[in-house]
């Protein structure tokens, strides 16, 4: 491989290539995939002069390290973490010029879960269905990165831009998830619906890019049995037989047979990407009509 590229020297727990995903293919059984914390992904790209659609690296908890073949501007956003270039401290949430052959390391997250690493030109792997995103459910796109993997970089799009927003540090002490009830809320008793709105839930360690699983009280069902498989949207709150809701994230299955008690609007999903296991979760019912004027979650 010739031209600009990076080599993964430390892949971390889970590092994947992500962009804005591949929407519009659910009828083929293909989920959207893409960056779970889209605002952080977009900001990282902006800081290095890329469009928001350029591919970045999404790290999970332990970060990653890369060696660049040619001098490259890199930015790390999302979950705050220590950033170094050849062992010397570098800023997080700002463009960093990395000399040819140098190693930039994004260390373990100090708050939150997922960091985003953008390079000038974006990750240039081959698109699949119009996207470079790794889809861990269907297996589309690049595999999760391993030590020694070499990734091409695209041509620069323009000079790095000044940041006009402070990188979001992730959720606070509680993850607040507004949801619109339905379409299968009638499958649950009034007590089950109250439990969802008032119960004390926490993020489960079994959560992943497919869904945020919860620990806490079980939601009481009014009906037995299961549904025929039906379409599952991004943000669906599906309730499996154990009664504990699962929030479907970007690699979710496009169909399922467990009832969906509500749907979390997409604009509220980014904080879920940064919620570490054990984070308290509060579900807040809201009306379907009319956009929210203010989001405090």
What role is predicted for each listed range?
Residues 1-297:
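Conserved "landmark" site that anchors the functional core of diverse proteins
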């Amino acid at each position: 491989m010739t031209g600009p590229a990076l080599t993964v020297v430390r892949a971390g727990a889970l590092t994947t290539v992500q962009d804005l995903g591949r929407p519009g293919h659910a009828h083929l059984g293909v989920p959207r995939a893409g960056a779970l914390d889209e605002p952080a992904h977009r900001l990282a790209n902006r800081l290095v002069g890329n469009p928001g659609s350029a591919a970045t690296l999404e790290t999970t908890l332990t970060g990653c390290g890369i060696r660049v073949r040619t001098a490259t501007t890199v930015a790390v956003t999302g979950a705050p973490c220590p950033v170094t270039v050849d062992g010397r401290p570098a800023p997080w949430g700002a463009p960093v010029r990395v000399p040819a052959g140098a190693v930039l390391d994004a260390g373990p997250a100090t708050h939150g879960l997922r960091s985003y690493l953008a390079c000038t030109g974006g990750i240039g792997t081959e698109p699949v269905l119009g996207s470079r995103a790794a889809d861990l459910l269907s297996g589309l796109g690049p595999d999760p990165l391993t030590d020694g993997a070499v990734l091409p970089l695209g041509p620069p799009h323009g000079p790095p831009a000044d940041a006009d927003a402070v990188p979001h540090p992730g959720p606070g002490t509680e993850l607040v998830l507004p949801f619109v009830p339905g379409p299968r809320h009638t499958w649950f008793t009034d007590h089950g619906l109250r439990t969802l709105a008032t119960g004390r839930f926490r993020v489960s360690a079994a959560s992943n890019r497919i869904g945020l699983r919860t620990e806490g009280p079980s939601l009481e069902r009014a009906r037995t049995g299961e549904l025929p498989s039906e379409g599952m949207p991004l943000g669906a709150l599906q309730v499996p037989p154990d009664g504990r809701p699962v929030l479907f994230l970007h690699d979710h299955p496009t169909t399922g047979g467990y009832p969906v008690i509500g749907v979390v609007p997409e604009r509220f999903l980014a904080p879920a990407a940064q919620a570490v296991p054990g984070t308290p979760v509060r579900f807040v019912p809201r009306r379907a009509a009319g956009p929210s004027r203010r989001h405090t979650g």
